[in-house]
Swiss-Prot record:
GO terms for biological process: DNA-templated transcription. The keyword Plastid applies. In plastids the minimal PEP RNA polymerase catalytic core is composed of four subunits: alpha, beta, beta', and beta''. When a (nuclear-encoded) sigma factor is associated with the core the holoenzyme is formed, which can initiate transcription. The lineage of its organism: Eukaryota, Viridiplantae, Streptophyta, Embryophyta, Tracheophyta. It holds the Pfam family RNA_pol_Rpb2_2. Keywords: Chloroplast, DNA-directed RNA polymerase, Nucleotidyltransferase, Plastid, Transcription, Transferase. This is DNA-directed RNA polymerase subunit beta. GO terms for molecular function: DNA binding; DNA-directed RNA polymerase activity; ribonucleoside binding. It comes from the Eukaryota. It comes from Citrus sinensis. The keyword Transcription applies. DNA-dependent RNA polymerase catalyzes the transcription of DNA into RNA using the four ribonucleoside triphosphates as substrates. Belongs to the RNA polymerase beta chain family. GO terms for cellular component: chloroplast; DNA-directed RNA polymerase complex; mitochondrion. It catalyses: RNA(n) + a ribonucleoside 5'-triphosphate = RNA(n+1) + diphosphate.
């Protein structure tokens, strides 16, 4: 956030700032913190000592560039070097060397990491903050039961509770509880210290029996008693050092380590002044917690809201990378310790470089980025998706919640989310409410809390000062929720304003306000902030819209939206998709793949992205926007990327839409479109698919890449070059060979031809046999080969196989079955493509491009699309673009409607088209049926909304099966497009066929075409020779499976076959 202290104006922060700040914090602080924790390592005889000198660590600049790392499938990382010393105590000398510890993956300019050529991003996680929390529950007898839960930095917890007899317990597990006296004594306090440090000693003395005194008579007795209760050990355990270590490891380390954040929270909650560097739970903490618990029993003190953001902390990319670095150093310590012992045992002279290996650090980060739930493959469908992915917040992951156990209260919106977590943007399905998105202006504070900016109002002067508040601080202020000065500081303030105070919304006088919000979009995420007129939509539809905008496919010819919100340039800029000038100067050369800039006496070459595949198979491509000889400034857009125009986000198209029914073809969520969208390539997109194959070294020899493949038709091999790899620019169809490969295999003696056996017997020549394992183009993959990569790893062994990647580009026009959507949750499937002459047309003769169902608006309460539709029509006629801030009713009532009608009226006057704005039915117009030329009976709403084409396309989903694989157990066709599966004929499908009376078709569906093995085999032979297909006599395989499963439950089920000739009953074994 940038702010001017005098004017108090603010700008929107960098949308990738959260990721950059987290990684910089890890490099600047996290690395040194973990390196300082690395211990000095000695051998068993204490003759050799190994230590690291942290002050001299350095990270080397990467050898590879980002683009090369992606192209060659490497990791974009930096080598970490640290000085280490090996001290020989007997000789008194030290050997010091700079050692290589390992590679640390770096963050690139997009705020992501490149691991093995794949863009990955680390998601921020929301966890319960360590500390103590008090809550109350109604017991079985209707009396409130108060408990205090202490949560450690590791996520471990134990509870303090008071029973009906006023005895205080520490519940260490679900079934086991220990007296608070025993716990305090086991932590090192005696009875006298306990009674001196509590406010209610009489309650402790009331349940202090002679037996209890004996248990806490000494620290050893208390530890034995605590261990016996905690570990559920019978008998009389004996006090020993190993017992203390086990208790320390299993209980105190996991449940009593508070960390810095936990110590701060504990001090604030219990009014303690224990130093911040003392991060372990002390007896003083436990006794103060018990005092507060007793006070709650007597009606003093306050309970905690576990879902308040002040009781949560953000585990950012810095914390996750630091944890992994610490884990790698622990593994490195074990390796060094073992190596030193081995060197001493074999009487070798170790050196620091011989002791240290880079494997622990490299493998730890590889496994973290590849396997950790919070490390995800970056979604690169469009520029908006890239930005939003890095700003996600997840309650899931290690130490967090799970989708099946999280309660509704956790998922729900909380007042403390105001200005920090978007109340709209979340995932749909089982994880709803558990994966959120950061508000635009929110940032992560030093203590892991989410902070939001506000303007502080001074009564005497008109100056304002911007400050960031954590969730625990803004409860003490009255925050004006929606005042008009957020945009226009010069206008007079209203007398009464809506205000938020202590999680309640009030209406108070302006003089009582302490803070005010800084921006209308402050409460929303990026996805929700791109929805114009969002205040007129139901929140559920706004949620769908913010999710569907991330699914929009970049089009061949992108177009800026007529009606937007003003955030489009910021999103496009921060996504890194457009090429931006980093220096000012003059363009001296421009090409399709680079731009050369001359400035400050230097020449800069800016490479452009050409037909790069995203991980969602969309096409990333940059188009130069500046010509030779043009002078440019720093920060100017040089080239537009996918889904950007002029440096602004452009996900869809402004097209002419009518809201009316048309012959039932737009029933429910179906959409009728004009063929103009196809012929003019309005919704045409490019998709790039990647196909790869690996060559291994088998036990029979290495696999070969060749164009000489026996037993295959020549037309399938027509596109291969002399090396056996498909040629660039080739047009390939389904079934064509992309890479020819032969795998050697051992053949049996009987499989050899007679001439082969003769050669072996006379000359001893071994005739090799190979199996064809070529890479073939699957169904639906037809297209043009645009790139072929042969990635050869070092060694070339079976552990480092060679990989050949083939990239095929497809041009996809919009067709029936594709999904389209607006920005208000109005989605639909293309049901029919009409000729232009049959589409309804306007009074000026223009046919509409798309027809939506009007019944999809009122019931779903997303009226914002109507405002956008009408304003887009006015903007198209006036050649204007509008940027609308949300909640414009703060200025006056019906502000949105007045704006739309005034613009329509002006468009009607300037274009001399009275039908654009007719006072009898404003926003609507009489249109004509393209088939007959007759006007429709009622006026129809027409306009120009912004419609997106989504990635859910029919080419990826439609599938048909003629023959394929069957499941081994049920013998039914497999399910799924990827397995060449078939459609299951279930109960409802059987009922439908029964309703039509198609008995023979139904029998085929349930026997020949499904799981009747013998009948399936007979069908082929009888079809070839032209005989009738015999009726199956025994049961199908799924019925036999059911019988066997019932038998396993001790239920016998038999079936009988009645002969058609003599009606004899024959029992058949199922």
């Amino acid at each position: 956030m940038l702010g001017d202290g005098n004017a108090g104006m603010s700008t929107i922060p960098g949308l990738n700032q959260i990721q950059f700040e987290g990684f910089c914090r890890f490099i600047d602080q996290g690395l040194t913190e973990e390196l300082y924790k690395f211990p000095k390592i000695e051998d068993t005889d204490q003759e050799i000592e190994f230590q690291l000198f942290v002050e001299t660590y350095q990270l080397v600049e990467p050898l590879l560039k980002e683009r090369d790392a992606v192209y060659e499938s490497f990791t974009y990382s930096s080598e970490l070097y640290v000085s280490a010393g090996l001290i020989w105590k007997s000789r008194g000398d030290m050997q010091e060397q700079t050692i290589f510890i390992g590679n640390i993956p770096l963050m690139n300019s997009l705020g992501t990491s490149i691991v093995n050529g794949i863009y990955r991003i680390v998601i921020n996680q929301i966890l319960q903050s360590p500390g103590i929390y008090y809550r109350s529950e109604l017991g079985h007898n209707g009396i409130s039961v108060y408990t205090g839960t202490i949560i450690s930095d590791w996520g471990g917890r134990f509870e303090l509770e008071i029973d009906r007899k006023a005895r205080i317990w520490a519940r260490v597990s679900r079934k086991q509880k220990v007296s608070i006296l025993v716990l305090s004594a086991a932590m090192g306090s005696n009875l006298r210290e306990i009674l001196e440090n509590i406010c209610y000693p009489e309650i402790f003395l009331s349940f202090l029996t002679n037996k209890e005194k004996k248990k806490i008579g000494s620290k050893e007795n208390a530890i034995l008693e605590f261990y016996q209760q905690f570990a559920c050990v019978g008998g009389d355990p004996v006090f020993s050092e190993s017992l203390c270590k086990e208790l320390q490891k299993k209980f105190f380390h996991q449940r009593c380590e508070l960390g810095k954040i936990g110590r701060r929270n504990m001090n604030q909650r219990l009014n303690l002044n224990i130093p911040q560097n003392n991060t372990f739970l002390l007896p003083r903490d436990v006794l103060a917690a018990v005092d507060h618990l007793i006070g709650l029993k007597f009606g003093m003190g306050t309970l905690d809201d576990m879902n308040h953001l002040k009781n949560k902390r953000i585990r950012s990319v810095a914390n996750l990378l630091q944890d992994q670095f610490g884990l790698a150093l622990v593994r490195l310590e074990n390796v060094i310790r073992g190596t030193i012992c081995g060197a001493i045992r074999h009487k070798l002279m170790p050196t620091p470089q011989n002791l240290v290996t880079s494997t622990p650090l490299t493998t730890t980060y590889d496994s973290f980025f590849g396997l950790h739930p919070l490390s995800q493959v970056l979604d690169r469908t469009n520029p908006l998706t890239q930005i939003v992915h890095g700003r996600k917040l997840s309650y899931l992951g290690p130490g967090g919640l799970t989708g099946r156990t999280a309660s509704f209260r956790v998922r729900d919106i909380h007042p403390s989310h105001y200005g920090r977590i978007c109340p709209i943007d979340t995932s749909e399905g089982i994880n709803v409410g558990l994966i959120g998105s950061l508000a635009i202006h929110a940032r992560i504070g030093y203590w892991g809390s989410l902070e939001s900016p506000f303007y502080e109002i001074f009564e005497k002067s008109k100056k304002v000062r911007m400050l960031y508040l954590s969730p625990s601080r803004d409860e003490y202020y009255m925050v004006a929720a929606g005042n008009s000065l957020a945009l226009n500081q010069g206008s007079p303030e209203e007398q009464v304003v809506p205000t938020r105070y202590r999680q309640e919304f009030l209406t108070i006088a302006w003089e009582q306000v302490h803070l005010r919000s800084i921006f209308p979009f402050q409460y929303f995420s990026i996805g929700a902030s791109l929805i114009p007129f969002i205040e007129h939509n139901d929140a559920n539809r706004a949620l769908m819209s913010s999710n569907m905008q991330r699914q929009a496919v970049p089009l061949v010819r992108s177009e800026k939206c007529i009606v937007g919100t003003g955030l489009e340039p910021q999103v496009a800029l921060d996504s890194g998709v457009p090429a931006i000038a980093e220096h000012e100067g003059k363009i001296i050369y421009t090409d399709i793949d680079k731009i050369v800039l001359s400035g400050n006496g230097n020449t800069y070459s800016i490479p452009l992205i050409m037909y790069q595949r995203s991980n969602k198979n969309t096409c990333m491509h940059q188009k130069p926007q500046v010509g030779r000889g043009k002078c440019i400034k720093k920060g100017q857009v040089l080239a537009d990327g996918a889904a950007t125009v002029g440096g602004e986000l452009a996900l869809g198209k402004n097209i002419l839409v009518a809201y009316m029914p048309w012959e039932g073809y737009n029933f429910e969520d179906a959409v009728l479109i004009s063929e103009r969208l196809i012929y003019r390539d309005i919704y045409t997109s490019f998709h790039i698919r990647k196909y790869e194959i690996q060559t291994h070294v088998t036990s029979q020899g290495p696999e070969r890449i060749t164009n000489e493949i026996p037993h295959l038709e020549a037309r399938l091999l027509r596109n291969l070059d002399k090396n056996g790899i498909v040629m660039l620019g080739s047009w390939v169809e389904t079934g064509d060979i992309l890479v020819g490969k032969l795998t050697p295999q051992a053949a049996k003696e009987s499989s050899y031809a007679p001439e082969d056996r003769l050669l072996r017997a006379i000359l001893g020549i071994q005739v090799s046999t190979s199996k064809e394992t070529c890479l073939k183009l699957p169904i639906g993959g037809r297209g043009r080969v645009i790139d072929v990569r042969w990635v050869q790893k070092k060694g070339g062994s079976s552990y480092n196989p060679e990989t050949i990647c083939v990239y095929i580009s497809q041009k996809r026009e919009i067709k029936v079955g594709d999904k389209v959507a607006g920005r208000h949750g109005n989605k639909g499937i293309v049901s029919k493509i009409l000729p232009r002459q049959d589409m309804p047309y306007l009074q000026d003769g223009r046919p509409v491009d798309m027809v939506f169902n009007p019944l999809g608006v009122p019931s779903r309460m997303n009226v914002g699309q109507i405002f956008e539709c009408s304003l887009g029509l006015a903007g198209g006629l006036l050649n204007r673009h509008y940027r609308i801030a949300p909640f414009d009713e703060r200025y006056e009532q019906e502000a949105s409607r007045k704006l739309v009608f005034s613009e329509l009226y002006e468009a009607s006057k300037q274009t001399a088209n009275p039908w654009v704005f007719e006072p009898e039915y404003p926003g609507k117009s009489r249109i004509f049926d393209g088939r007959t030329g007759d006007p429709f009976e009622e006026p129809v709403l027409i306009g120009k909304p912004y419609i997106l084409k989504l990635i859910h396309q029919v080419d990826d989903k439609v599938h048909g099966r003629s023959s394929g694989h069957y499941a081994l157990v049920t013998q039914q066709p497999l399910r799924g497009r990827s397995k060449q599966g078939g459609q299951r004929v279930g109960e409802m499908e059987v009922w439908a066929l029964e309703g039509f009376g198609v008995a023979h078709i139904l029998q085929e569906m349930l026997t020949y075409k499904s799981d009747h093995i013998r009948a399936r085999q007979e069908v082929l032979g009888t079809t070839i020779i032209g005989e009738t297909i015999p009726n199956p006599e025994d049961a199908p395989e799924s019925f036999r499976l059911l019988v066997r499963e019932l038998r396993s439950l001790a239920l016998e089920l038999n079936h009988f076959v009645v002969s058609e000739k003599n009606f004899q009953i024959n029992k058949k074994e199922a």
